[in-house]
A protein has these predicted regions:
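Noncatalytic, beta-rich nucleic-acid-contacting surfaces in large DNA/RNA-processing enzymes
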Residues: 1-212
Length: 212
């Protein structure tokens, strides 16, 4: 075909050398099998597939944005975090929508995310904000974690405006700070009641007012 025989010999020789150590056929077979599996998953379980990719890249904001754009093109809804629906990583709800993973929220650690999900799975959804703060381990979910949840919309399911968490009472105290203090007092009182001779279950600690 008009090609220089020496050049062709050189190319063939290089290919032979490469094939001697590259295991090209088995390598290609393995990768084709992986490609088939991922293509099958994406075709039959698109939301779950995309959620898994997002979880894999949860610390790479640019990659997450690209994947969210791809979800949009695939008509898959992506929703923000929710303490009553999100998992530790990105997950899919009953409607086939992808929920932002709690561990992907800036300022939230993996231990905090796991504590929230484990408590919810063990004792049911959080009824309201005060039920959440009564039940969650404040050692795992500290003030910074609570602030991150408020800012990211993780508490939106409770019907409280995000800015209200940072509002102040007539003493100049931020609601988020009074909420943490309430949680600490409630959990301490509950522990003391459980350890008492009478084994009382009822704990009475006044909830802090929500700024309006």
């Amino acid at each position: 075909n008009g090609h220089d025989p020496k050049v062709l010999e050189k190319i063939w020789s290089d290919w032979e050398k490469f094939a001697s150590y590259a295991f090209n056929k088995s390598h290609a077979t393995c990768y084709s099998w992986v490609a088939y599996q991922t293509a099958y998953m994406k075709a039959h379980y698109p939301a779950e597939y995309m959620a898994a990719l997002m979880t894999r890249r949860f610390s790479q904001i640019t990659e997450i944005q690209k994947l969210m754009e791809e979800c949009k093109a695939m008509n898959i809804s992506t929703l923000g975090p929710d303490v009553n629906e999100s998992f530790v990583g990105f997950g899919v709800n009953g409607e086939g929508e992808i929920r932002f993973g709690l561990s992907a929220i800036k300022g939230m650690g993996g231990a905090a995310a796991e504590a929230i999900v484990q408590e919810r799975e063990k004792n049911g959804p959080y009824k309201d904000l005060f039920d959440f703060i009564q039940r969650i381990s404040l050692k795992d979910v500290n003030r910074k974690g609570l602030e991150s949840l408020a800012l990211s919309g993780g508490f939106d399911c409770f019907g409280i405006k995000r800015e209200d968490y940072f509002g102040k009472n007539n003493k100049g105290e931020m609601f988020l700070d009074t909420l943490v203090r309430y949680g600490q007092q409630y959990q301490l009182a509950k522990q003391q009641a459980a350890n008492s001779l009478f084994g009382e279950d009822d704990v009475e600690v006044s909830t802090p007012p929500i700024p309006k």
